[in-house]
């Protein structure tokens, strides 16, 4: 029997959170650096109108989501976690990206039990359905919403989520730290 139900976001969580930046800099003829990405709202980062960002995203979303790079150690750690836990990918991506998402995970040999393409940032209902023990996320707003609903959240560090955390959120700087945190939570759960 598997120990924990682990929900995992995709973009910025298992993937490089700044991969889209080179596309945006080319498209908008800008020179934004990773250090300047201090907001989750990309239109705000680029200082452009939301409609201009949406036009850019519609043009490049398939290419970006097909080619984005994995964060270091993700594959090895997920391989280990999968042996003893249920891994559910829960993403706010829109339904049009369902096939791209599935193929991306398969092509990178990322193990999982299920993928949920929500088309919304409200992940609380799905976390409840999955009886989520731990949710791994990069969005500060999602982390706060999940944690306020009673879920333990591991927030993977980015330039855009460095805000105060509550008692249900643990910040991790990389996937090695995430692995250690999950091991500790798993040991605590067994002891109870």
State the predicted function of each range.
Residues 40-76:
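Metal-dependent phosphoesterase signature
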Residues 62-89, 94-102:
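Short, acidic loop-to-helix structural element flanking the phosphoryl-transfer center
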Residues 115-119, 169-177:
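Short acidic-hydrophobic, aromatic-tinged amphipathic segments that line or gate anion-handling sites
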Residues 1-53:
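Active-site neighborhood of HAD-like aspartate-dependent phosphohydrolases
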Residues 125-129, 178-190:
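Short amphipathic alpha-helix with an adjacent loop that forms part of the alpha/beta core around
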Residues 135-173:
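Acidic, Mg2+-coordinating phosphoryl-transfer loop and its flanking beta/alpha structural elements
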């Amino acid at each position: 029997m598997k120990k924990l139900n682990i929900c995992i976001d995709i973009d910025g969580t298992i993937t490089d959170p700044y991969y889209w930046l080179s596309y945006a800099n080319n498209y908008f003829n800008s020179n934004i650096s990773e250090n300047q990405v201090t907001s989750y709202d990309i239109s705000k980062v680029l200082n452009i109108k939301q409609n201009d960002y949406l036009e850019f995203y519609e043009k490049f979303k398939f290419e970006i989501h097909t080619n984005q790079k994995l964060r270091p150690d993700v594959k090895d750690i997920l391989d280990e976690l999968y042996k003893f836990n249920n891994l559910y990918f829960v993403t706010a991506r829109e339904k049009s990206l369902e096939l791209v998402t599935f193929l991306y995970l398969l092509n990178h040999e990322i193990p999982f039990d299920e993928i949920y393409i929500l088309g919304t940032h409200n992940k609380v209902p799905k976390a409840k359905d999955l009886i989520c023990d731990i949710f791994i996320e990069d969005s500060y707003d999602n982390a706060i919403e999940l944690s306020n609903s009673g879920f333990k959240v591991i927030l993977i560090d980015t330039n855009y989520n460095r805000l105060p955390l509550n008692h249900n959120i643990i910040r991790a700087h990389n996937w090695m730290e995430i692995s250690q945190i999950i091991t500790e939570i798993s040991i605590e759960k067994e002891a109870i």
